[in-house]
Every structure is written in C-alpha cells, then in structure tokens.
UniProtKB/Swiss-Prot annotation:
Function summary: Lytic polysaccharide monooxygenase (LPMO) that depolymerizes crystalline and amorphous polysaccharides via the oxidation of scissile alpha- or beta-(1-4)-glycosidic bonds, yielding C4 oxidation products. Catalysis by LPMOs requires the reduction of the active-site copper from Cu(II) to Cu(I) by a reducing agent and H(2)O(2) or O(2) as a cosubstrate.
Gene3D superfamilies: 2.70.50.70
Name of the protein described by the UniProt record: AA9 family lytic polysaccharide monooxygenase J
Paired cysteines (S-S): C58-C194
Stretches the record annotates as Disordered: 272-301
Binding site for O2: H180, Q189
Alphabetical list of PROSITE patterns matching this protein: CBM1_2 (PS51164)
Alphabetic keyword roster: Carbohydrate metabolism, Cellulose degradation, Copper, Disulfide bond, Metal-binding, Monooxygenase, Oxidoreductase, Polysaccharide degradation, Secreted, Signal
Record remark: domains: Has a modular structure: an endo-beta-1,4-glucanase catalytic module at the N-terminus, a linker rich in serines and threonines, and a C-terminal carbohydrate-binding module (CBM). The CBM domain is essential for binding to and subsequent oxidative degradation of polysaccharide substrate.
Gene of this entry: gh61-10
Signal peptide: 1-20
Subcellular location: Secreted
Provenance organism: Neurospora crassa (strain ATCC 24698 / 74-OR23-1A / CBS 708.71 / DSM 1257 / FGSC 987)
C-alpha cells in the first residue's frame, strides 16, 4: 500500500512539474508584436538539464527558420514566455511551480541567423534579471527572482539592445534558469529559446565572448544551489553583462512593453526573412510596416506569411495565419498551438 501511494505521489509531482514547464515563444521589437516568426521554437516545453550538451545552445531539436526580426541598435526587444505553446493569456503564470531563478539574454553575431547553429560563434550577455533579497523573506524561495518578474509581467521581459552593437545578423538566446531542484548536481532546469534578428544602425563595439556549451558548469554556484534555505548572495552563471547592456534589479516591477503591449499588434507586411513585402533588396535592414487596423488589432489573414514551423494559430493567437509556400497550418497542441508544417 505504501509503495502504491509513493508511485501515485511521484507521478503527481511529475505531472505538476511538467505543467509548470515553459517556453520563450514570442518576440516584440520596440512594441511591435512579431509573434514566433523569428523564433527557433523548441519541440516541447521541457527544460535542458545537461549544461555540457549541445542542447544548451538553443534547446533540443531546434533548427533555423526563414524569419528574421529587424532590430535597431539601441532599441528594445521583449521576449515572451508562457507555459503552453501558443497560450498568451495572462491568467496563468508564465512559468509556474515556484520555478524561481534568473532570466538572462545573450547575443551571438553570425553571418546568417537563419542557418547558424550557434556553436561556432561566441556569445556575450546583454541582460540579466537575477536575484535580490526580499525584506521579511525567510528563505530563497521568498526572494525576488527574474522568473518571478516574468510572472508579474505576463511572461514579458524588456531587453535593451546595446546602441554600439555592430550591425548584422545575430542569434538572441533567451534563458530562464529554474532552481527549485538545483540543490543537487544536474537538478537545475534551463528554459532556452533562440530568436533570429538582424540589427541595423549599429556601432563598432567588440565584446569578449564565451561558448555554449562551455560557459557553464553544473557545479557553478549560480547553478547548483539550494534556494529552499537562506540565500545571502546570488550571482547568476556566465560572464558579466557587457557595457551597454542592462542588469535589472529583481523585483523592480514591470516597465515599457512588459506592461503596455497588446497581443495582435504584429507587422502587416513583413515577409519571411524580415524583408519588406515590396521586395526591397538594398541589403539594409527593412522598415517595419505599421500594424494593420491600429494598435491591438490582428493582422488580416493573407496580409503576411508565417515562416516554416512558425505559429499560425491557437487559443489567444491573433497574428498571421497564412503559411509560406509549401507549408500548411496544422494543429500541434490543440487548442493552444498550430504551426506551419510541410504540406503532405
């Protein structure tokens, strides 16, 4: 009887933990909603736990997509996380289950963001929202954390792009580290997605870089830590944030797009690859078309195309629904998420 009860309890905890898993899915650029058009969406909402594996770069099973989101140096992108694919509701926590830990953003300059695998180039950190002591808190669980800020801001986190960042293609690596089981080696959970962006109007900064895998070790104090005890100090893993980047104080509240952006304000005439629908080919970063119908209104079906494997439908989704040639919008996790899959 006891063994049966243990099995039931273990299964219940596993289900609860799985439900609490999450994915960085959408990207906003200066308040414009690009949905998942330039995101290498992970195949599931499960975490990466082996920091020495290839999966720590951009998550398991991901590959390049055709879409690239245009970003201006000095501008702001907003990464967006939710537990289930395609669910952008603020009713549920972005990442549940008391998955407290830091949120960090890295960039890697590449020749072509749609094909680079992220393992050959160097990475540098441009943003960190890690930890701060909460007055009256007893243990680390009670403190302020980056993932707690994600929950408070409907899964959104504003990230400033350094104004002196050189122009060109980049992979933007968004990482949320959950520390609820990190008291033992291999217990930390990394939730990672890579976005493909093209930066324009940049400068000439030259940043020191690290490589993934290699930048983290399972025994790093920011990775192996018991947050169910008193936490007197916490330093997030990896290098320091580069000059021109941002270190946000955990618990400082929602700002900018985190609190004001409305789902559905997506570009109405940006084709896959981030090029203007008019077909401009001068090599410069594209201009972003004004959202159709005003702020908060969805793009009209057919007004823009969704890149291969990008989101094209689902509960609360109001972006583009027409897939690129050779792809059809198919339900992957109904009713939450549909994506453009090869037409069979």
């Amino acid at each position: 009887m006891k063994s049966s009860l243990l099995v039931v309890l273990t299964a219940g905890l596993a289900v609860r933990d799985a439900i609490a898993h999450a994915i960085f899915q959408q990207l906003w650029v200066d308040g414009v909603d690009y949905g998942s058009t330039c995101n290498r969406l992970p195949t599931s909402n499960s975490p990466v736990t082996n920091v020495g594996s290839r999966d720590v770069v951009c998550n398991a099973g991901t590959r390049g997509v055709s879409g690239k989101c245009p970003v201006k140096a000095g501008g702001t992108v907003t990464v967006e996380m939710h537990q289930q694919p395609g669910d952008r509701s603020c009713k549920s926590e972005a990442i549940g289950g008391a998955h407290w830990g830091p949120v960090q953003i890295y960039l890697s300059k590449v020749s072509d963001a749609s094909t680079a695998d992220g393992s050959s180039g160097g990475w540098f950190k441009i943003f960190s929202d890690a930890w701060s002591k909460k007055s009256g808190g007893r243990v680390g669980d009670d403190d302020n954390w980056g993932t707690r800020d994600l929950n408070a801001c409907c899964g959104r986190m504003d990230v400033l792009i350094p104004k002196d960042l050189p122009s060109g293609d980049y992979l933007l690596r968004a990482e949320a580290l959950a520390l609820h089981t990190a008291g033992q080696s291999g217990g930390a959970q990394f939730y990672i997605s890579c976005y493909q962006i093209t930066v324009s109007g940049g400068g000439s900064a030259n940043y020191a870089t690290v490589k993934f895998p290699g930048a983290y070790r399972a025994s790093d104090p920011g990775i192996q830590i018991n947050i169910h005890a008193v936490v007197s100090n916490y330093v997030a893993p990896g290098p320091a944030v580069v000059a021109g980047g941002v270190t946000k104080q955990a618990g400082s509240g929602c700002i900018g797009c985190e609190s004001t952006c409305k789902v559905g304000s997506s570009p109405s005439a940006v084709a896959p690859g981030g090029k203007p629908a008019s077909g401009g080919s001068d090599g410069n970063a594209p201009e972003v078309a004004e959202p159709s119908g005003g702020e908060g209104s969805p793009s009209a079906p057919g007004a823009c195309e969704v890149a291969a494997y990008g989101q094209c439908g689902g509960d609360q989704y109001s972006g583009c629904t027409q897939c690129a040639s050779g792809y059809t919008c198919k339900a992957v996790s109904p009713p939450y998420y549909s994506q453009c899959a090869p037409t069979s």
